[in-house]
Amino acid sequence: MKKTKFFLLGLAALAMTACNKDNEAEPVTEGNATISVVLKTSNSNRAFGVGDDESKVAKLTVMVYNGEQQEAIKSAENATKVEDIKCSAGQRTLVVMANTGAMELVGKTLAEVKALTTELTAENQEAAGLIMTAEPKTIVLKAGKNYIGYSGTGEGNHIENDPLKIKRVHARMAFTEIKVQMSAAYDNIYTFVPEKIYGLIAKKQSNLFGATLVNADANYLTGSLTTFNGAYTPANYANVPWLSRNYVAPAADAPQGFYVLENDYSANGGTIHPTILCVYGKLQKNGADLAGADLAAAQAANWVDAEGKTYYPVLVNFNSNNYTYDSNYTPKNKIERNHKYDIKLTITGPGTNNPENPITESAHLNVQCTVAEWVLVGQNATW
């Protein structure tokens, strides 16, 4: 009889352990407080896909942490607010994320959430599901109802009246104008026929939280099938077709480019891997494709490859005498989250056969950039 009693007690203990484990996986708090959060996103701009997709919040998730442990988590679809999240009074950490897709967040510790990463994808290039985050925020919850982003005139504890700001993890780089104005030395001799726009040396992975989102992952992506082995070319480099676009003449309301992740190439010494936006096509002489001695001479000058094709690369947000920036902006030699880099390119002569080598100060290009947040950076480039 005693053995049977101990056996049943053991089964009950195991059952309780299983229940506790389930509760840790899906935090449910029968606390004495609730919090409701209203979100503010950056304004949308003209996207490569549907314009509003840049700012669309398909899924908003709010997590409340008591120390390292997740006390509550709640999500809302196609919404910019999450209401009545059940938790307990006291000092807590609030974490807000949007467009996390299939990412599993339930039960994660605060440290695990802060360590999350994302990768650049084909879906990003149509502005769909651009992930957004706000830095973890320390708050003090009072018993009863708590609010962030609501008018302070109603009931409850209004922690902040302003909506919580959330920012895209991605940046956008795009040509908004490309024009050919050959200088006197090349005018009426050479012409350029654009065929493709490429994104080169794009970081594959990014952190989701932190003062900088650049991490130590050494993988990069390119839209070109050509192996350049230039001074900027990274060792871990993979081709993806979605960093390549057939050429369409860009305009302010029809930008041509790509969404990318943070990349820092501001080091004063050593090897750097700057993110590049590049237009590619044929260099022609007297209206005809280069051939024979003309092709050989252009190759010897490092203007074209064996097929007579040339590249006009623009190092995004880079400090160069060939580049000018709008509004007295100082280039930072890095890609920053939630920025859009709008580039006007003027071509004044032949390009290069290796877009992943440093450009010379006498390159045949002018670049004008505009930077904004969805910080616009306006960059003007002249080749």
UniProtKB/Swiss-Prot annotation:
Keywords: Cell adhesion, Cell outer membrane, Fimbrium, Lipoprotein, Membrane, Palmitate, Signal, Virulence. A lipid is attached at C19 (S-diacylglycerol cysteine). One of its GO terms (biological process) is cell adhesion. Its main location: other. Residues 1-18 form the signal peptide. Synthesized as palmitoylated precursor. Efficient export to the outer membrane and integration into fimbriae requires lipidation and subsequent proteolytic removal of the lipidated propeptide. GO terms for cellular component: cell outer membrane; pilus. Belongs to the bacteroidetes fimbrillin superfamily. FimA/Mfa1 family. This is Major fimbrium subunit FimA type-1. The gene is fimA.
